[in-house]
Swiss-Prot record:
UniProtKB keywords: Coiled coil, Cytoplasm, Motor protein, Muscle protein, Myosin, Phosphoprotein, Thick filament
Residue numbers spanned by region Nonhelical region: 1-122, 420-640
Signal sequence residues: none
One GO CC term on file: cytoskeleton
Tissue expression notes: Found in all adult muscle tissues except in indirect flight muscles and a set of temporary abdominal muscles. Not detected in larval muscle.
Top-level taxon in the UniProt lineage: Eukaryota
Claim: Cell membrane is one of the keywords in the record: no
GO biological process, one term: mesoderm development
Cystine bridges: none
Modification comment: Phosphorylated.
Organism this protein belongs to: Drosophila melanogaster
Protein name: Paramyosin, short form
Role summary: Paramyosin is a major structural component of many thick filaments isolated from invertebrate muscles.
Record's subcellular location: Cytoplasm, Myofibril
Amino acid sequence: MALALKQRPSRFRPTTTTYEDNYGYTMNFYQPMLDYLDAKAKGLEVKKPHLPWVSERGLKQYRPSNAVRQYNADEIVRLSRTCAARADEILLNFRAQKRSPFSVQKLVDASRVTKHLEPDTVVERSRQRRRRRQEELEDLIKRDTLKILQRIRKIELDNELDKMSDDFKRSIRGKSASAIAQALLSESEKNIKTAKKEEEDYIAQTLVRSSRAVSRARSRSSSPLDGQYRAHALHIELMDDRLVDKLDHRVSSSLHNVKRQLSTLNQRTVEFYADSSKQTSIEIEQLNARVIEAETRLKTEVTRIKKKLQIQITELEMSLDVANKTNIDLQKVIKKQSLQLTELQAHYEDVQRQLQATLDQYAVAQRRLAGLNGELEEVRSHLDSANRAKRTVELQYEEAASRINELTTANVSLVSIKSKLEQELSVVASDYEEVSKELRISDERYQKVQVELKHVVEQVHEEQERIVKLETIKKSLEVEVKNLSIRLEEVELNAVAGSKRIISKLEARIRDLELELEEEKRRHAETIKILRKKERTVKEVLVQCEEDQKNLILLQDALDKSTAKINIYRRQLSEQEGVSQQTTTRVRRFQRELEAAEDRADTAESSLNIIRAKHRTFVTTSTVPGSQVYIQETTRTITE
């Protein structure tokens, strides 16, 4: 098998190319997905397949990021030869064994990619199509019959008494009871006539639609079929004819019943309107008077409640403005205090740096003192040998004098640093006093804010009491509405079916009143929401005040810590002063020792002079004739 393929990108996988990893892709990716799709098609509840995109089963080589290696013709020939040789080796040692059903089933599942295909033939498709047509026809007939029956029941139950137009309502207003009864009778007759016409038109349309559907079904079923299915098609046509006859019979009987019921209903309505027109007119006038009184009461109550709520809302808004202003002032104070704290921290860092510099200078002075100690020991050794090396003693004296000058300058610098630190400590103490004053002022402001918050809470309690009063008024109005509804129910029991429209008018009026009540309830709920929002803002102000108090406490703690650090620095300064005093005492002691050494040197010089004065040598020269010079040295010891 020779394949001549061009070099293509690594992700391109043509369908006609042989790859090494096709079996791995099939068994680990495609086969679980195909099994999942088959189970979903059967309606089973199956978990989604786990596709191993990570290297959890040794499938790292099947990642899409890896390049796919293609085979050329020589590699395919080599692989086929190795496979044939391996097959020959296996056949030599092969023994036929009986497989278990489980292993056979697993082998079959592994060898196929698509499985469980249902049979699909022409006969089955034609049967399904015929069955589908028959079901559609039966559903259409059922829907038509149900619509006709529902329409008949609606006509029987609904007398069209509640369907008054707006123009008719306007024409009735302000008329007497007899005129209203006459108008209702004429309107009912018109409604009955229009209902009859609509019913006849609807029944005619349904009959035409059903006949068309039947003819369409027959034309479909009369299409040329195979010889073995024609008898079945004729049987279906006979069943369709029977169904159409039954439906026609049902429709005609239902129409006859509807006409008879409509005529009896018309007679009853005329009699009822004639008998009960007087009673209904009197009751209508009484109910109108009551409704007008209730409307006036409700309007007055609503206006009064609106005014009260508006006044309360304005008061709450003013209190909120005051609380917001106080909150802004507190925030400004907190910002100022935070800036002062940052300045204090910077000043503290400067003081700490200066102390570190003084400590470094102190360490240098200690090192110098150690050097001076060593030099003093050397001076003592030189003083012991002063009689032998006076010159060396003088040089060491000069060096000691220069070093003493350096120590005196260092001492002067330490004294100046001490004065500077004392000045800085006084500045820090003054800053601390200013911060404490500002803290007292902020505490006073916080107490004022707490008093104002208590006042706001008292106002909120008063608003809640007013809301309770409004709820009692609402309950009394609901009781009145219930009494009116009970009265209306009594009128409905005593009145005739023809007076339902008049009562419905009153019910509409009561519904309007109820709607107005609901609007008032909604407005009341909105006011309650506004009050809750105000309470939330008050709580937020309280929380902010608590946070401000916490911040003040933190500032106080920071100031306490700074004072403690300042005390520590004072102690360190006092210790440094003690050390500097010790160094000055040592320097003075060294000066005394040097003075004693100088005195010893002076005494040594004086003793040397005395010794020289005691032991003097005299040199005399004499000349002899003949140019000879004689030198005579004589020593004299002067004894006292």
